[in-house]
Amino acid sequence: MAKNNAVAGFNALNGVELNLFTTDELKAIHYATMEVLMDPGIQVSDPEARQIFKENGCEVNEKTNVVKIPEYLVRKALQLAPSRFVLWGRDKKFNTVQECGGKVHWTCFGTGVKVCKYQDGKYVTVDSVEKDIADIAKLCDWAENIDYFSLPVSARDIAGQGAQDVHETLTPLANTAKHFHHIDPVGENVEYYRDIVKAYYGGDEEEARKKPIFSMLLCPTSPLELSVNACQVIIKGARFGIPVNVLSMAMSGGSSPVYLAGTLVTHNAEVLSGIVLAQLTVPGAKVWYGSSTTTFDLKKGTAPVGSPELGLISAAVAKLAQFYGLPSYVAGSOSDAKVPDDQAGHEKTMTTLLPALAGANTIYGAGMLELGMTFSMEQLVIDNDIFSMVKKAMQGIPVSEETLAVESIQKVGIGNNFLALKQTRQLVDYPSNPMLLDRHMFGDWAAAGSKDLATVAHEKVEDVLKNHQVTPIDADIFKDMQAIVDKADKAFRGM
């Protein structure tokens, strides 16, 4: 079912590939999903969305708000949805291509409500505030393996005082030149977000549409519901040319079947229903196939994200997206640890590597702790190192006449070493080279202060926040952007 311009299962960045399903198994998931979209269907709470579905041939029950979506509409939507689109940054060097069968990218986690702060070997977890968003954005602007910025935490100091979500739009744009992905948008305020971007482009609405420097994420309500907010984010995103991420957060054993294959069916139905709505609204609307689906721990009553199941589900979703010819955005680099510790390192590596090898286009989760509730800047810079190692693993072992190196082996001969070879010196950067992870012997490590990884990461965070320079927004333009936020605040307060 992949489009002709997409190569299912291929990832341009990796030489090692993880295949979870046969073509027949992918078809089985698809056909099971088509059954579910007709029976029981999807509950659509938004009247405007129901009308769009109805006008395009869906059966709509206005008493129950249930919409039944036939397979031919799904197939039509999948043909219309682009396999490739660009996430624009304020600085074009940060432009990021999202393409089915393209490169793997990473972004930070969102959206938590707390931050874990590290000082003198101690951890303190506190409510997140707007300044935390600014600091994390600056950190992501620096981090070479974070390709764009997703809203990491809530500005809880603004909650109830102003238009929080609108503040959460401008603050990231001001503190990173990378693309901004708004993970917590409010449907009724999308016009404000659009106007902020329009102001950035000097009032040029067409430029804002062609080069959107932000995008949005919405979540269906599992099982099988599209809320008013979700529908309005989809509809307005399509109309304004804003890329939209339809991301299911199903919990296997809770809001979806305990069998992971069954969970993929409900997940697929939820995501496809949103993608169909986007394409019925504006054919060709830019959409991701998204996932933060995991399992429900029936013994502890939690939804763990540092589990092998999350990694497997995210890898599976990447394969489903490739089957449909769509860019994917999946959870990974996830951890249930409360602080940046051994558990975090293990869980993050596992849940990153699986979807990366499956060819997910974006893996989000950098900096996340405590089942998605907490964000750590120290963990973010550690994750930046983990991603560089995963990238190296993804390259595999290239085999060619050059890399087989027969002439070099013959030249060096028996019992000698390869250190003096010109080839070795030229490829000094060929091996993996982490920034923070320590590879010294004990004596050198002790002489440098015997610092553990969290301490080294904290020092790097302080250095970046003090010294890294973000490409600024022109002062007059920023004033116009701020005026939109002020307008939203006045509307929130009823002024």
Swiss-Prot record:
Pathway: One-carbon metabolism; methanogenesis from trimethylamine. One of its GO terms (biological process) is methanogenesis. GO terms for molecular function: trimethylamine methyltransferase activity. It is an enzyme of class 2 (transferase). Induction: Induced by growth on trimethylamine but not methanol or monomethylamine. Part of the mtbC-mttB-mttC and mtbC-mttB-mttC-mttP-mtbB1 operons. It catalyses: Co(I)-[trimethylamine-specific corrinoid protein] + trimethylamine + H(+) = methyl-Co(III)-[trimethylamine-specific corrinoid protein] + dimethylamine. Keywords: Methanogenesis, Methyltransferase, Pyrrolysine, Transferase. NCBIfam families: trimeth_pyl. Can form a complex with MttC. This is Trimethylamine methyltransferase MttB. It comes from Methanosarcina barkeri. The lineage of its organism: Archaea, Methanobacteriati, Methanobacteriota, Stenosarchaea group, Methanomicrobia.
